[in-house]
Design a protein with these regions (language model features):
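FNR/FR-type flavoprotein reductase catalytic core
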Residues: 92-197
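Ferredoxin-reductase
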Residues: 2-102
Length: 197
């Protein structure tokens, strides 16, 4: 896949760096991706602990926004972790690799993985989605699918989303608010919560 765009979706000054990364994958239909599935990202090595490559799954945040069917988007937070034994801080291998990619860079993707979201047969059924942090990614694709590809949903659609701070509300902050476009849909409501833990 080729990186087409990597845009910061958290405001400057936010403790978290969260990026929306657009990948050109040829024809996404050839991959057979469905809303709710993940792609695998292979990070070439060698790595700190001797692995020849590192593998990480990312849920597809959106598909084919350009109308040609060749793009998918993923939501990536630059992560670090503390080694339990040494107390040392280590950079997340895949998240740092992806956040450092520039347009035109090639990356290895595999997939799809996981089961797609299944909708109830009746469009009058209520839908409840709960996500935290970058866990909002699959719901972004799902809500867009409901209202843009299926022509709407008659049941109540509720999204509950939380983050450590308002600055970390991916796709729901001053820099980017994708869900705002669905607020005029009679059946959609989004609720946010902030918790420092």
């Amino acid at each position: 896949a080729t990186v087409k765009e990597s845009s910061l979706i958290t405001p400057e000054g936010s403790e978290a760096e969260i990026r929306n990364i657009v990948l050109s994958v040829g024809d996404a239909a050839d991959f057979g991706f469905s809303v709710g599935q993940s792609i695998g990202v292979v990070v070439p090595g060698p790595h700190e602990f001797g692995q020849s490559e590192h593998f990480r799954l990312y849920t597809v945040a959106n598909m084919a926004t350009n109308g040609s069917g060749d793009e998918i988007e993923i939501c990536v937070k630059r992560c670090s972790y503390i080694d339990e034994f040494s107390g040392e801080k280590h950079a997340g291998v895949a998240s740092h690799y992806l956040c450092d990619r520039q347009p035109g860079d090639e990356i290895i993707v595999t997939g799809p993985y996981g089961l797609p979201f299944t909708l109830p047969e009746e469009k009058t059924a209520d839908l409840l989605m709960i996500g935290l942090g970058t866990g909002i990614a699959p719901f972004r694709a799902f809500v867009r699918h409901l209202y843009e590809h299926l022509g709407g949903w008659d049941g109540r659609v509720r999204l509950f989303y939380g983050a450590k701070s308002g600055l970390e509300m991916a796709y729901m902050n001053d820099r980017q608010n994708d869900f705002e476009m669905y607020y005029d849909e009679a059946t959609f409501k989004a609720f946010t919560a902030v918790s420092p833990r």
